[in-house]
Amino acid sequence: MKVLSIDFGTKRVGLAISDPDQIFAFPYKVMERTTRDAMFSELLEIIENEKVGDIVIGLPLSLDGEDTLTTRQVRNFAASLERRVDLPIHLVDERLSSIAAEDELKEAGLWDRKRKKNLDSQAAKIILETWLARA
């Protein structure tokens, strides 16, 4: 089964997905945050359509490993999602994933506007690659 990775942000939610063998990670899409219900509805549809078996969520710890306000928001989001799906949810340290994502997009030659549009799904891909390497 596939693994869905989520980079949860205040404005956008980046998604990445693995292949069924859980070897490769691919950027999937960027969801604009609207209402909480709309966000969960779209996520549940993706989970069902893509036959997702595990969910990985990036946990934004501070550089010294401490929880921040955003960390608590992500933990609340993960708990809300856990109540809606019967799948394992894994929290993965995402420190510096956005910086690594931006570097990858620059290396791919994407110009600024296109890079910004794809940054969140690329960060989700890096989070997923981290999890797949450990699994």
From Swiss-Prot:
Family annotation (InterPro entries): RNaseH-like_sf, YqgF, YqgF/RNaseH-like_dom, YqgF/RNaseH-like_dom_sf
Compartments (UniProt record): Cytoplasm
Keyword Nucleus: no
Predominant location category: cytoplasm
Keywords: Cytoplasm, Hydrolase, Nuclease, Ribosome biogenesis
One Pfam family hit: RuvX
Molecular-function GO terms, alphabetical: nuclease activity
Gene Ontology BP term (one): rRNA 5'-end processing
Enzyme Commission identifier(s): 3.1.-.-
Gene Ontology CC, one term: cytosol
Enzyme class: hydrolase
Similarity comment: Belongs to the YqgF nuclease family.
Protein task: Could be a nuclease involved in processing of the 5'-end of pre-16S rRNA.
Name of the molecule in the record: Putative pre-16S rRNA nuclease
